[in-house]
Amino acid sequence: MAIVQNDTMIKAYNKLDDFNFPSAITSFSVLGEVYSEVMQVVVRSDLKDTVKTLADVKGLRVSIGDAGSGTEANAKALLAAYGVSTDDITVQNLSVNNSADAMKDGKLDVFFFTSGAPTTAITELQTAMDIYLLGLDDAVMDEFIANNKVGDYAVYAKMAVTHDQYACIPADAPITTIGVTATYIVSNSLSEDQVYNMTKALWESKDEIAKAHAVGSGMDINNAFVTIGNVPLHPGAAKYYTEMGLNVG
């Protein structure tokens, strides 16, 4: 069982685009979409007058996430949408925790991270130093969403990040960025009964998940398989959703 970004999941299942495996990976199926992940761009506050859009990061030290990660793929695509290549920046491939540490140490100017918000590393960083999250321009987001389908499937959407998620965002000025859904996938080797019980436990624990992390409040069973493309539901998950009155096709 794993949680994956839907864009990466569909690429893996169909061996699309920048997915560098020798063949498609079809040994898994979907348990359910659970929450939204947003593309977060964190910037040192002393750069606020100069870094107003992603186009302004040229010449800076930028972490684009772990090599081969969904964050790295998202960062490269977003930078390209603003006319920035990796040759225009000093690239670092750091995890979110290492990015936050490097920024605190004065060794990094900007970092990307795709995840549910809030993210602990960013929440803790904003208490240690002044930072801001960079919003994206509407026109660029519209073009990005239109031009970055995964195969035939639209997986990206505009999403807001607010003061309730990060105190460094003004209460009266939420930012808008690009989001993608995070999905639980399971091995096809698991039985129908096993995955049925796992799916049932997930959705019956929704309120407890929300108490543990804010992303749980956005869980909606009606969106459990909306943007999974051609990746199939596991039969056990499909059985549960059918019992809940959802049309699994």
Model-derived regions: residue spans:
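Immediate post-signal peptide segment of exported/extracytoplasmic ligand-binding proteins
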Residues: 48-61, 235, 239-249
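Beta->alpha turn/N-cap motifs
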Residues: 3-17, 96, 112-119, 137-138
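Short helix-initiation/N-cap motifs at beta->coil->alpha
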Residues: 86-104, 116-118
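Periplasmic-binding protein-like
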Residues: 202-220
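Short helices/loops that flank or line small-molecule/ion binding pockets
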Residues: 1, 77, 97-111, 123-127
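Ligand-binding "clamshell"
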Residues: 12-29, 121-138, 144-164
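Short, glycine-/small- and polar/acidic-enriched structural segments
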Residues: 1-58, 66, 73
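C-terminal lobe and pocket-closing loops
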Residues: 134-197, 248
